């Protein structure tokens, strides 16, 4: 009797993610689980078919072989020479691994460590500079609390696999070669679960969300990563959990930009303040401070406020705040103000006035004049 397509069994498309496949499996496994359908042979057969499809489609190598060769690519009974099936990567890996001492001799496959998780955390500049403790809600796979992660129904335990006799591997012939492969019955574990847990359906893990209090150190920046050991997904059947990596990104700020441990900002000043000098207030992350502006300050001049930047997350060094003053042209002038400016402009004209009061402009226009003279000569 021909087998149904594994994707059809689970009701998923060929481009479905592993997460979608897991969701489909859990929904169907709950529906057809023998504990929910006692004595129903059809439900039991459906459950076995669903479990088989799930095991193939969540194993990267087996899924690739199935996608390429169909059921023949994952049929453990198709071995002897020819291209009829089998996982060729595993076959040749075993052959050459044995020759060069690599191989997978020595018993059953160890239960897999849990997957690492990544959490993207966005912070304001103030939060990144000062540090804080954040409550993070993490969706993950946790050890099943009903079976304590064993996958077996409460009161039972996994039994030794009858196919490989607990070794996790079987010997198969490939033409002239006898090679070792992971046991197709227990998938290399050496044990099988005859009575799966009714909560995790033999997986030993369940989907769960947990809340963690994570301390974010002062001075972090976009691209920094914080590792929380053992806070990733639970491992298979009691294996160690993976790690959680918190990936930091810092939002753009309305006033400051950051470069390493230094902060930068632009501060507008009036024409009169730039010419006559005086004190202005500039913002810092700790509040406003006074900045003395010398007379005849030109727009674009940079002022450094030492120690007003960011404390390094990796040392005790503290950056600076660099303020660039930008002269702002007055707008919405009254007629009286315009007249005063005209009088002021007139006071700057005359022989030598431009050179005295605007040396850069004088030099610029002299250069322009010379440029056109050279062009026409």
UniProtKB/Swiss-Prot annotation:
ZnF bounds (CR-type): 131-209
CXXCXGXG motif repeats mapped onto the chain: 144-151, 161-168, 183-190, 197-204
Binding site residues for Zn(2+) 2: 161, 164, 183, 186
Disulfide bridge map: none
Keyword Nuclease listed: no
Matching InterPro entries: DnaJ, DnaJ_C, DnaJ_domain, DnaJ_domain_CS, HSP40/DnaJ_pept-bd, HSP_DnaJ_Cys-rich_dom, HSP_DnaJ_Cys-rich_dom_sf, J_dom_sf
Location (main, coarse): cytoplasm
Cofactor(s) needed for function: Zn(2+)
Residues the entry annotates as binding Zn(2+) 1: 144, 147, 197, 200
GO molecular function terms attached to this record: ATP binding; heat shock protein binding; unfolded protein binding; zinc ion binding
PROSITE patterns: DNAJ_1, DNAJ_2, ZF_CR
Cofactor note: Binds 2 Zn(2+) ions per monomer.
PANTHER family registered for this protein in UniProt: CHAPERONE PROTEIN DNAJ (PTHR43096:SF48), DNAJ HOMOLOG 1, MITOCHONDRIAL-RELATED (PTHR43096)
Quaternary structure, from the entry: Homodimer.
Family, as annotated: Belongs to the DnaJ family.
Protein name: Chaperone protein DnaJ
Organism expressing this protein natively: Shewanella denitrificans (strain OS217 / ATCC BAA-1090 / DSM 15013)
